[in-house]
Amino acid sequence: DRLTAERSRVLVAIEGGSASGKTTLGELLQNVYGCPVFHMDDFFLRPEQRTEARFAQPGGNVDRERFLEEVLIPLREGRPVDYRRFDCATFTIAPPQRIKAGTLNIVEGAYSMHPDLAPYYDLSVFLPISAEKQRERILKRNAPAHAKQFFDRWIPFEQRYFDALDVRNRCDLILSADG
C-alpha cells in the first residue's frame, strides 16, 4: 500500500520455484487490489528459440526479450500491454489481449528476477519451498508424465538459475508459503 501511495505505477515480481505459491499469491493480490497479473509461464521459448546455447544460459528457457518488450517496458511507461501468451500445447503465440497498466502490476513466475528484467521492478518477493513440499504439490496438481517433466527438466533449470544468479538474495522480501 505504501508503494502505491507514493507512486503512480508499481511493478512487483513474485519469484520462486515450481509450486511455491507464486500464482496463488498473484491471484490473491489481483482479488484484493484489482491489479493485472502477468505470468512468466506465458513466455516460454518458441521452437526456433530452443537451442542448446539458449538452454545453457541460466534462465535461458524463457523469452525474456519478448517479456521485456511486450510487458515490462509498456508497464513502466504506463502504456497498455498487448499480452500474447505462449500456448504450450501448440507451441504458438496467441493473438494479443490488451491489458491496461494498473497502479499495481504483478509479474509472477520463475525467471521474473533475471538480471535483464529485475531493474524494472519496484519490489521483488521470493517464495522458497522445500523439495518435499514441492514434490507433494507437483504430484497433486499434475498427471504423472507431466510431473516427471518438472522433476527431470524444469526444476533443475530453475535451480541452476536460482544458484547461478543468486536470485533469492537479490529479492527484497522472502515469504515462506511452505506450510
Model-derived features with residue positions:
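Extreme N-terminal, non-catalytic leader segments
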Residues: 1-12
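Small-molecule kinase domains that catalyze NTP-dependent phosphoryl transfer to phosphate-bearing small molecules
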Residues: 92, 114, 144-179
